[in-house]
Design a protein with these regions (language model features):
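Terminal, low-structured helical/coil segments at or just beyond the last alpha-helical repeat
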Residues: 1-5, 11, 135-164
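Alpha-helical segment of the N-proximal tetratricopeptide repeat
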Residues: 3-40, 44-57
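Canonical tetratricopeptide repeat
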Residues: 10, 44, 78, 85, ...
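Position-specific recognition of the canonical hydrophobic site in helix A of tetratricopeptide repeat
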Residues: 16, 43, 50, 67, ...
Length: 164
């Protein structure tokens, strides 16, 4: 008996939860054999590839999702993160801007935007966005204090005012 896509999704998630990303990847591949444009399987596969540091490959899967659903917020956020991690901050910022056009107060997009701005040496802009996102979600204040992306500005007086 063949497993249904729903059963396969549950199995893949269980494998991920128990620390078996390769097994989960195999399950998501099975789903994609059955349904090549299955959004959840494409996103999960992109996530696994991203966690394995294979950002270029992850982006391919997020692009496939966006080919089906151009306003898929999760795919846009994850694609932005993948570009951020490979140092292509402007493309990452473009992804976050697309999310913010759909959901202007999306905390993840705003926080990631601040991070990419700082990493691209646009410190003042990044600090403004960081300050704005902290107004929406105070937990971002604590997160920013310890975020590796902000280590280069730890001694910046404006950053210290925002996070301390």
């Amino acid at each position: 008996m063949n497993a249904t896509i729903e059963e396969l999704l549950k199995s893949g998630q269980m494998l991920l939860n128990t620390g078996n990303p390769k097994g989960a990847m195999t399950v998501y591949d099975k789903i994609l054999e059955i349904s090549p444009n299955h959004i959840d399987a494409l996103i999960k596969k992109g996530n696994i590839l991203g966690k394995l540091g294979k950002y270029d490959n992850a982006i391919i899967y997020y692009d496939r999702v966006l080919g089906e659903e151009s306003q898929n917020i999760l795919a846009l956020l994850n694609k932005g993160l993948a570009y951020h991690y490979i140092g292509q901050y402007q493309i990452a910022l473009d992804c976050y801007e697309q999310v913010l056009m759909i959901k202007p107060r999306n905390v993840t997009a705003l926080y990631n935007k601040a991070s990419s701005l700082v990493k691209s040496k646009r410190i003042e802009e990044g600090l403004k966005v960081l300050s704005d996102v902290i107004e929406i979600d105070f937990s971002c204040k604590v997160k920013a204090k310890f975020d590796i992306d902000f280590t280069s500005i730890q001694k910046n007086n404006e950053f210290r005012k925002i996070v301390l």
